[in-house]
Curated annotation (Swiss-Prot):
Disulfide bonds join C14-C23, C29-C40, C34-C51, C53-C62, C70-C82, C76-C92, C94-C103, C109-C120, C114-C129, C131-C140, C147-C159, C153-C168, C170-C179, C186-C197, C191-C207. PANTHER family: NOTCH LIGAND FAMILY MEMBER (PTHR24044). PROSITE patterns: ASX_HYDROXYL (PS00010), EGF_1 (PS00022), EGF_2 (PS01186), EGF_3 (PS50026), EGF_CA (PS01187). Coiled coil: none annotated. It is found in: Secreted; Cytoplasm. Human-specific protein that promotes neural progenitor proliferation and evolutionary expansion of the brain neocortex by regulating the Notch signaling pathway. Able to promote neural progenitor self-renewal, possibly by down-regulating neuronal differentiation genes, thereby delaying the differentiation of neuronal progenitors and leading to an overall final increase in neuronal production. Acts by enhancing the Notch signaling pathway via two different mechanisms that probably work in parallel to reach the same effect. InterPro entries: EGF-like_Ca-bd_dom (IPR001881), EGF-like_dom (IPR000742), EGF-type_Asp/Asn_hydroxyl_site (IPR000152), EGF_Ca-bd_CS (IPR018097), NOTCH1_EGF-like (IPR049883), Notch_signaling (IPR050906). Glycans are attached at N7. This is Notch homolog 2 N-terminal-like protein A. It is linked to Defects in NOTCH2NLA may be a cause of chromosome 1q21.1 deletion/duplication syndrome. Deletions of NOTCH2NL (NOTCH2NLA, NOTCH2NLB and/or NOTCH2NLC) are present in patients affected by microcephaly, whereas macrocephaly is observed in patients with NOTCH2NL duplications. It comes from Homo sapiens (Human). Residues 1-24, 25-63, 66-104, 105-141, 143-180, 182-219 form the EGF-like domain.
Length: 236
């Protein structure tokens, strides 16, 4: 509503819930969010508000008591920042180089002592490494030689130790991760690009290839049907 003075000037008298020279802002204090007796102070030009807290309270909405541990005991050590989660609980954000619930420990993992993809955790200023399968040692620096334990490779296969793992080299006629399967040349087919596999012996095969157009440089040429003589191969 516009109110006019005798001299011709006037102002806008805003209805409840609106503020500003032209009542263009909603009153941010309409729903008073300030707790514990706090007073809402509107910033009309910005449509925002702040809480002026009663004695003994703090926080954006005056929701925390100044007797909160973050204020009284200051539990976060070594420059850590205390975050109030509720009236009496908190969480510390630690400075780089420190860890622990209250940032009380030096972060022993900062130097990345754990090797080979292992996980580092700090406990009481010391690090502990959780190793991936295939590695051992305080820092997971030692490769486990799986081939020291017999029986990994079946049917006379030879065990080859690899970093963090091992591989079985199979005798003729066997295949699979543990040399536990009979080798059938065309099952599954090794031929690619639509080629057809034909078994030519106990351990040999050939691929009958489809006619294929191949680009070499700027020229196109047609490759006729050809036969590739395959030999036994190790799938591993």
């Amino acid at each position: 509503m516009c109110v006019t003075y005798h001299n011709g000037t006037g102002y806008c008298k805003c209805p409840e819930g609106f503020l500003g020279e032209y009542c263009q802002h909603r009153d941010p204090c309409e729903k008073n969010r300030c707790q514990n007796g706090g007073t809402c102070v509107a910033q009309a030009m910005l449509g925002k508000a702040t809480c002026r807290c009663a004695s003994g309270f703090t926080g954006e909405d005056c929701q925390y008591s100044t007797s909160h541990p973050c204020f009284v005991s200051r539990p976060c050590l070594n420059g850590g920042t205390c975050h109030m989660l509720s009236r009496d609980t908190y969480e510390c954000t630690c400075q780089v180089g420190f860890t622990g619930k209250e940032c009380q420990w030096t972060d022993a993992c900062l130097s990345h002592p754990c090797a080979n993809g292992s996980t580092c955790t700090t406990v009481a200023n010391q690090f502990s490494c959780k190793c991936l399968t295939g590695f051992t040692g305080q820092k997971c620096e030692t490769d486990v030689n799986e081939c020291d334990i017999p029986g990994h490779c079946q049917h006379g296969g030879t065990c080859l130790n690899l970093p963090g793992s091992y591989q079985c080299q199979c005798l003729q006629g066997f295949t699979g991760q543990y040399c536990d399967s009979l080798y059938v040349p065309c099952a599954p087919s090794p031929c690619v690009n639509g080629g057809t596999c034909r078994q030519t012996g106990d351990f040999t095969f050939e691929c009958n290839c489809l006619p294929e157009t191949v680009r070499r440089g700027t020229e196109l040429w047609e490759r006729d049907r050809e036969v590739w003589n395959g030999k036994e191969h190790d799938e591993n």
